[in-house]
Structures are given as structure tokens and as C-alpha cells.
Amino acid sequence: MNMITFMLLLSLTLSIILTTINFWLAQMNPDAEKLSPYECGFDPLGSARLPFSIRFFLVAILFLLFDLEIALLLPLPWAIQLSQPLLTLLWTSILLLLLTLGLVYEWIQGGLEWAE
């Protein structure tokens, strides 16, 4: 058995054992104190479980999408050196066009407006 297979089996076995022990030893008796929000040791001034703005959530999701776009485009200089650089540039252009159209759509729909 080669070393990679051994390490994969060892990590899988260890993960399964630790997860099983965690579920077996965990205390499953939540009370009001455990379910209350923690605010750095101070008594909460109000309800700490207030909903946050949907606009904030939308802007955060858009940030994650465009951050992922940057991560997908980072290996582009090395991908151009492959056997078919035109195909690589075509797929890159399609990805950029799709994300740009999505951004324009969100802008037109008013999804990027912070205040209404």
C-alpha cells in the first residue's frame, strides 16, 4: 500500500472515530441559559436576535460572487500557455461577460442601492 492511500485511510478513519466520539459524548440538554445570546459577559440591552437587512445580505452575496470570479481568473496567465490559448480566452470572456451582465442586472433592479 503506498503512502498516499495509507494517509487517506488514516485520516478518514480518524475523522470517523472523532465524529462518533463527539456525538456519543455530547451533552444534549439545552436550557434557557445555553440558548440565550452571549454579549461579552454583559446583560443584553435588547433582543440580540434582530434580523439584519436583506440589502446587506445581497451585497455580501455579490461580494462573494465577484471574489470567486477573481479566484477563477488568477490562473489565467498560466492557462494561456496551454495548447489551445484561444479556447481559454473564449471561456474567460464568457465568464466575464456573464458576471458583468449579472452585475448590470442587479444595478438596474436596484439591488446595489443601500438606502431606498
UniProtKB/Swiss-Prot annotation:
One of its GO terms (molecular function) is NADH dehydrogenase (ubiquinone) activity. It comes from the Eukaryota. Its main location: mitochondrion. InterPro entries: NADH_UbQ/plastoQ_OxRdtase_su3 (IPR000440), NDAH_ubi_oxred_su3_sf (IPR038430). It is a multi-pass membrane protein. The chain crosses the membrane at residues 6-26, 56-76, 85-105. One of its GO terms (cellular component) is NADH dehydrogenase complex. It is found in: Mitochondrion membrane. Its EC number is 7.1.1.2. It catalyses: a ubiquinone + NADH + 5 H(+)(in) = a ubiquinol + NAD(+) + 4 H(+)(out). Keywords: Electron transport, Membrane, Mitochondrion, NAD, Respiratory chain, Translocase, Transmembrane, Transmembrane helix, Transport, Ubiquinone. Belongs to the complex I subunit 3 family. Core subunit of the mitochondrial membrane respiratory chain NADH dehydrogenase (Complex I) that is believed to belong to the minimal assembly required for catalysis. Complex I functions in the transfer of electrons from NADH to the respiratory chain. The immediate electron acceptor for the enzyme is believed to be ubiquinone. This is NADH-ubiquinone oxidoreductase chain 3. It comes from Struthio camelus (Common ostrich).
